């Protein structure tokens, strides 16, 4: 999604009203329940949250010069910089070592890379299809990508073929290297 992204893709940049900020907070907590503990630390009442409208109907939400999350269609998706600050707040999957170089180049994640010995998926009941997940790698401390499940984790385990996760944002892509300043 962010293979080609620059300041030229920005159309408008406006301050968000406090009522909109409250609804965004509740939407974030609804989508990621574990964020409830840190949501007031993340977006304090007097924080100036900005919405940055970009091409391809992408909206970035930033505090100061840091993009915290973005929106394409309905769902809010955290940036990796935000995930690195609050890693325990998001659903996580783990890939094996062999898939790292492919994910870092923006490739979607295949099911065998999620079911091999170095990989890990959440225990039952698992995650539903279309869930936003943080992608960690075997023996690595920080997340390397944000993705969207193309099938449930139970289906990934049972089918074990095809694409399992669509990579939306990864280390080294244009959003990772993007600066608002």
From Swiss-Prot:
A cellular component annotation (GO) from this entry: cytosol
Similarity comment text for this entry: Belongs to the TMA20 family.
Gene3D superfamilies given in the database record: 3.10.400.20
Keyword flag RNA-binding: yes
GO MF term (any one): RNA binding
GO terms (BP aspect): formation of translation preinitiation complex; nuclear-transcribed mRNA catabolic process, nonsense-mediated decay; ribosome biogenesis
Entry function: Involved in translation.
Name recorded for this polypeptide: Translation machinery-associated protein 20
Disulphide linkage map: none
Database matches in SMART domains: PUA
Assigned keywords, A-Z: Cytoplasm, Protein biosynthesis, RNA-binding
Main location group: cytoplasm
NCBIfam families: unchar_dom_2 (TIGR00451)
Domain PUA: 90-172
Localization terms from the record: Cytoplasm
Native species: Eremothecium gossypii (strain ATCC 10895 / CBS 109.51 / FGSC 9923 / NRRL Y-1056) (Yeast)
Lineage of producing organism: Eukaryota, Fungi, Dikarya, Ascomycota, Saccharomycotina
Quaternary data: Associates with ribosomal complexes.
């Amino acid at each position: 999604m962010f293979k080609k992204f620059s300041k030229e893709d920005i159309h408008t940049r406006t301050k968000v009203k406090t009522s909109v900020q409250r609804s965004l907070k509740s939407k974030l907590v609804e989508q990621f329940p574990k964020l409830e503990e840190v949501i007031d630390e993340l977006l304090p009442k007097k924080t100036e949250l900005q919405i940055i409208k970009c091409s391809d109907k992408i909206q970035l939400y930033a505090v100061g010069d840091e993009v915290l999350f973005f929106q394409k269609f309905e769902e809010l998706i955290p940036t990796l910089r935000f995930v690195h600050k609050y890693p325990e707040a998001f659903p996580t999957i783990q890939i094996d070592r062999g898939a790292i170089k492919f994910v870092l180049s923006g490739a979607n994640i295949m099911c065998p890379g999620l079911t091999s010995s170095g990989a890990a998926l959440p225990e039952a009941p698992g995650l539903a299809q279309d869930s936003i997940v943080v992608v960690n790698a075997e023996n690595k401390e920080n997340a390397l990508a944000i993705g969207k499940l193309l099938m449930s984790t139970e289906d990934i385990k049972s089918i074990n073929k095809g694409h399992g996760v669509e990579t939306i944002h990864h280390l080294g892509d244009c959003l990772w290297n993007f600066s608002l300043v």
